[in-house]
Design a protein with these regions (language model features):
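Short beta-strand micro-motifs in enzyme catalytic cores
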Residues: 38-42, 53, 88, 139-141, ...
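Beta-rich strand-turn-strand
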Residues: 101-106, 115-121
Length: 181
């Protein structure tokens, strides 16, 4: 298992020692609280005594990413428009860890099935990352799913318009080299 850029609280729990670099929160207030994210404005004091009056923290649920490979060696990508970027891109299957799911693995398997119609196969969690430890509170659980097979048609949410693309390794390399992922 690889842990990359995990937030300080996560590392401290693992080490079971006090974090001498932690910032002191002097005040905290919610600016926005939505089902998918919340924003806090905090006044913080750094260990060196400096104070930051407006530090924004984004609270998100944990996320999952899936590198999925079919039995015949094709990589499953999703092509979709992303309004935040105002661009259509190729992406790995990804989504939110749903509260009703018992684990990130169950969330990852559900996302792959819902968005692509693929499932089964062998699953391995290979990495846990913090997408942006400076401002985000969540972790992303990354999985490799091999030998997956088509089970059903995708079951998309109303906000999703996804084209499922099965790509060879050469096609994936081309997308990466041309910054299309």
């Amino acid at each position: 298992m690889i842990y990359i850029c995990s937030p300080n609280y996560f590392i401290c729990k693992e080490m079971k020692e006090k974090d001498d670099m932690a910032w002191k929160v002097l005040s905290s207030q919610y600016i926005s609280q939505e089902p998918w994210f919340s924003v806090r404005k905090e006044k913080v004091q750094l260990p060196n005594g400096n104070t930051i009056d407006s530090y924004y923290v984004l609270e998100y649920p944990n996320w999952v990413n899936v590198i999925a490979i079919t039995k015949d060696g094709k990589f499953i990508f999703e092509r979709q428009y992303r309004h935040g970027l105002r661009n259509t891109s190729y992406e790995l299957c990804a989504g939110v860890c749903e509260k009703e799911d018992s684990s990130p693995l169950i969330s990852a398997q559900s996302e792959l099935m819902e968005e692509t119609g693929y499932g089964k196969g062998e699953w391995e969690e290979f990495m846990i990352i913090s997408p942006n430890p400076g401002t985000h509170t969540n972790l992303t659980y990354c999985y490799l799913a091999t030998n997956v097979e088509k089970i059903s048609e995708p079951h998309l949410e109303v906000t999703e318009d996804i084209q499922v693309k099965l790509l060879t390794i050469e096609e994936v390399k081309d997308l990466l080299e041309n910054n299309k992922v």
